[in-house]
Amino acid sequence: MPLKLSKELGFVIPLVRVRDEIALGPFTYRILIDGVVLGEDEVFPDDCLALEAGPIDTPVPGRVVKDPSFGLPACWIAPEERDLATASGYTVVDAATVIGTHLNHILGQQSHLLLGQDEVQALLDTLAAAHPQLVAGLVPKLLPLATVTTVLQRLLEEGVPIRDLRRTISSLAAVAARTQDPAELVRIGLGGAIVQTRCSLREPLMAISFASDLEDLLTQAVRASGSGAYPFDPALGGRVGEAVRAAAAPLIAAGTRFAVVTTPLLRRPLWGLLNA
C-alpha cells in the first residue's frame, strides 16, 4: 500500500515499522507519525468485519462498531457468517485489511507530515538531472528550500499530489518573485491537475460559491486579522460552515463531486474553517 500511495502522491512514503506495545489492550492497535497518535481502534483477528457500504437485505448478528477508516456502520462477525453477510449486501474484509486500509487512509490524509526538507531536496536533485536550469533558477535563487518544502506540504495537506514535480516547480518559479504567499498562487498553474483530483476529464464539476456581499464581509475579516490563523468571528464562521454543509448535503447524497470556489485571499482561511 505505501508503494502505491507513493506513486499517487509523488514522493516515497517511509517504511512502516510495526512493534508490540504492551500498554495497549490485546486487540488494540495505534497508528503514529513522529510519535503522535493519529489513529487507534480494535480488530479481532479471528473474525471478519462486515461493512454496510450499501443497502442491506438481512442484518447479520455481530459486534457492532464503526469502520475505522470512513466511519461506516459495521460489525465483527464469525468467519462462517461471511457468505451470508456478503449475500445480504455487506462488504466483508479480514482484520489485516481493516488495519491496512486504516493505515493507507491516514497516510493519504497526513502525507504532508512525512515530507521534510531532506525529502524535498532528494526530489529536486532527481528533477535537476533532467531539468537543471529549472531547479537552479528556483532554489535558492528565488526561494529557499524551506519555502519550497512548505509549498509542497501545503499542496499535499489539501489533497493535491506533487507527482508532476516539473509542472509544480515551473508554476512555483513563475509566481515566486511576485508574491509573499507562493503556496497560494502556485495553484493557478496547477488548476487543471487540481480539478482532475475531483473529477474525470469529461465529468462536470459542480461548484458552491458565495454571495458577493458575504464574500466582501469575509474578505474584510481576513484583511483585518492580518496573518491571523482564525480570521473569522466564531458566530460568522459557524453560520458559513452550516450554510456550506447545507449546500453540499444534496451533492454528497447524490455522490456528485463538487468544489467550493472563492477568491485567492479567502480560499485558504475558508479551507481551514471548513476542515476544522
Question: Which residue stretches match the model-derived regions?
Answer:
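Membrane-embedded alpha-helical signal segments
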Residues: 1-276
